[in-house]
């Protein structure tokens, strides 16, 4: 049975979207991975662009609110920003909650930097 992972940030616009795409790419289908936001906005074009550089297309990802996942069981709930960590809801079952804080990217260079940091973290986790 696949492990279920939910990645949370505030806007579900950059860090969590990149993490979802990277996790799916790195894990080769061994996990069911979702991302969501506490206050979803829109996927940032910079996130789409820097992921495309790696051959990962997140342009079809839709924004999701954490509310869509309340009551579901996950093996891991990972927050990637401090705000999401502070207000992360409780999920049923034996969910392991992890906090991987990443800075909010502001320009294309910082999007690449954060993407690479997230990728390294995921790679070491799923290896």
Question: Which ranges hold each PLM region?
Answer:
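Generic, ordered loop/turn and secondary-structure boundary motif
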Residues: 19, 59, 67-70, 92, ...
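Conserved active-site segments centered on acidic
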Residues: 2-67
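Conserved small-residue
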Residues: 12, 51, 77-78, 118
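Phosphate-binding/catalytic loops
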Residues: 85-127
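Short glycine/proline-enriched coil/turn segments at helix->beta-strand junctions
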Residues: 28-29, 73, 93-96
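Mid-chain, well-packed structural core segment of small domains
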Residues: 61, 67-92
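Cytosolic catalytic domains that perform sulfur/thiol-centered chemistry
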Residues: 2-5, 69-80, 111, 120, ...
